[in-house]
Amino acid sequence: MDALKQRHLKLLYRQRGSASRTIDYDVVIEPELREDGDLVTDSQLTEQDDQSFPDIQVPSPDRVDDFDLNQGDGLMDKATANEDDIDHVIGDEVAAVNAPVETSDLVIDTTQFDSMTLSQLSTPLTSMATIDVLRRLLETVILVTIEERTSQFNRAGSARLRLKLKLEIKILTWFLHQSKEDLITISELNLSNNDLLYRLKQISLLKNSLSRSLLDVRSAISSYEGPNNALSEEQVALQNFKRINELILSQRIDTIINNNLPPDTSTFDTESKKGLLPTLKTLNESLQNTIG
């Protein structure tokens, strides 16, 4: 009992020293916790540290509520050995939970979004604010719970209770980390969704503006092409008439030229009694008669 009194007296000195630096703080010596709620003496702590306790299988986080800490008949060597091994066991369980899940059979019906407008597809600001508030609230509650479990762990005298509290702290820490990551991912997805919808809306507005500009340009082209088409048709008709007149005139000129040409003297008719050949023959005969 003297050792216990001295231990509590030292604890009182430490608490008074820390309390002197604060205000409105009552100095209270909290007793060590046991599963049965009774106080623990130094001799009892020594006996409990030497005792073994049943082997406890660490469950996955989704089966923590149904987990019985009293299950199993196997015995462990030391309570401290269990506390060191629990980190590896929990790490294996967390890795199993985080293993990739086959999603080949997962089919999402996207046709339900075809009839929705851009405003219906966007995430409201109230929903995004709710996600952020939920994340902060969950973080605050779990951190407070972890602090309570840590305080109980530091004051626990039973090895079984220390292991139970350490397991709870590990599970709560893992759950807080995963929940924060999931909620942050959901918020980022909603932000990306709203950003893409905003860009799509801007593209739709630009498309409508360009369509109206194209209609205006086509209307202006039609207004200019109407008179120009009529003029071009008249010009084509005049060009056709001009070509016809030129062809007729060229044919008439060719006919007149052919009629005014002299007779062709390259060929002679030997039987004809008119022309140059008979005259030459007559002159030749006259010369022969004169000479002869």
Swiss-Prot record:
Sequence segments annotated as region (Interaction with OKP1): 129-247
Domain of life of the native organism = Eukaryota
Keywords assigned: Cell cycle, Cell division, Centromere, Chromosome, Kinetochore, Meiosis, Mitosis, Nucleus
Cellular component terms per the entry's GO annotation: kinetochore; nucleus
The record's region (Disordered) falls at: 42-63
What is the annotated localization of this protein? Nucleus; Chromosome, Centromere, Kinetochore
Gene Ontology biological-process annotations: cell division; meiotic cell cycle
Give me the ranges of the annotated region Interaction with NKP1-NKP2: 268-292
Could you confirm whether the keyword Glycoprotein appears in this record? Answer: no
Which Pfam families does the UniProt entry name for this protein? Answer: CENPU
Q: Where is this protein chiefly located?
A: nucleus
Keyword Electron transport set for record: no
The entry describes its oligomerization and partners as: Component of the heterotetrameric kinetochore subcomplex COMA, which consists of AME1, CTF19, MCM21 and OKP1. The COMA subcomplex is part of a larger constitutive centromere-associated network (CCAN) (also known as central kinetochore CTF19 complex in yeast). COMA binds the centromeric nucleosome-binding protein MIF2, and to the outer kinetochore MIND subcomplex, probably via AME1. AME1 interacts directly with OKP1 and an NKP1-NKP2 dimer.
Q: Which family does it belong to?
A: Belongs to the CENP-U/AME1 family.
Q: What does this protein do?
A: Component of the kinetochore, a multiprotein complex that assembles on centromeric DNA and attaches chromosomes to spindle microtubules, mediating chromosome segregation and sister chromatid segregation during meiosis and mitosis. Component of the inner kinetochore COMA subcomplex, which connects centromere-associated proteins and the outer kinetochore. COMA interacts with other inner kinetochore proteins to form the inner kinetochore constitutive centromere-associated network (CCAN), which serves as a structural platform for outer kinetochore assembly.
Q: What is this protein called?
A: Inner kinetochore subunit AME1
Q: Which gene encodes it?
A: AME1
